[in-house]
């Protein structure tokens, strides 16, 4: 009888432990979902900052083209991971390669100043390039380099889901818009990339350094970018009942 009593108590003990474990699992799951809701993250989904981090770690040691042999740092992108406006250039320069951040050289300083002059801030946008590694001598990107690197940029766009993309210069504009027309012909014209994302091509800020006469057009195009973004936001607000 004693053995049976002990066995019965042991079975009761195991049942209690099992129930307690089930309770803990439910509690942890509930608290995790509540945490997601507080952060504005849908259940079962990861936020854009986490997804961008995952993408960075998946490509930080990329060796798909020869540029990796010359780089000091991979220049992934920087800015607000939930930005409504995304700026895209062509490739990192010397300062970008040294610091691992996009648009931190002379062209970057001009861009930051110009954004401020039209009421925009770098803190609110996301900036990336077609290439993540610096081409030697700041030469133009080669077709094979663009081919292997462009999917990374596409994934960044997919994660960030910007309302508006501003392509800076020939390479970014021609690539995203699938056109052979030069930037002087297509700049300042609203076009479409995918779904609800519009694109406005503008001069690359580096071009304005070498051709100061273009800076006025550069600023006017950024004003257009600002106004289009406001228009998109106002349109969305008017749909809310």
Describe every region a protein language model picked out:
Residues 18-28, 33-241:
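A polyanion-binding, active-site-adjacent surface
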Residues 1-29:
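Non-catalytic accessory regions outside enzyme or core folds
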């Amino acid at each position: 009888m004693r053995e049976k009593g002990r066995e019965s108590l042991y079975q009761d003990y195991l049942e209690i432990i099992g129930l307690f474990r089930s309770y803990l699992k439910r509690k942890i799951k509930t608290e995790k979902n509540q945490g997601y809701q507080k952060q504005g993250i849908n259940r079962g989904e990861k936020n854009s900052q986490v997804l961008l981090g995952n993408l960075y770690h998946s490509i930080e040691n990329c060796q798909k083209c020869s540029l990796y042999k010359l780089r000091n740092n991979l220049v992934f992108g920087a800015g607000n991971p939930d930005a409504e406006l995304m700026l895209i250039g062509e490739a990192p320069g010397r300062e970008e390669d040294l610091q691992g951040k996009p648009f931190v050289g002379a062209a970057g300083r001009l861009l930051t100043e110009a954004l401020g002059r039209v009421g925009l801030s770098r803190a609110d946008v996301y900036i990336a390039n077609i290439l993540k590694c610096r081409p030697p001598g700041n030469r133009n990107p080669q077709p094979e380099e663009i081919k292997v690197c462009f999917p990374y940029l596409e994934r960044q766009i997919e994660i960030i889901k910007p309302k508006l993309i501003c392509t800076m210069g020939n390479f970014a504009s021609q690539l995203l818009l699938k056109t052979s027309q030069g930037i002087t012909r297509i700049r300042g014209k609203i076009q479409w990339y995918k779904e609800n994302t519009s694109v406005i091509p503008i001069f690359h800020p580096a071009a304005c350094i070498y051709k100061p006469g273009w800076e006025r057009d550069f600023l006017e195009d950024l004003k257009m970018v600002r106004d289009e973004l406001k228009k998109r936001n106002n349109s969305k607000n008017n749909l809310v009942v």
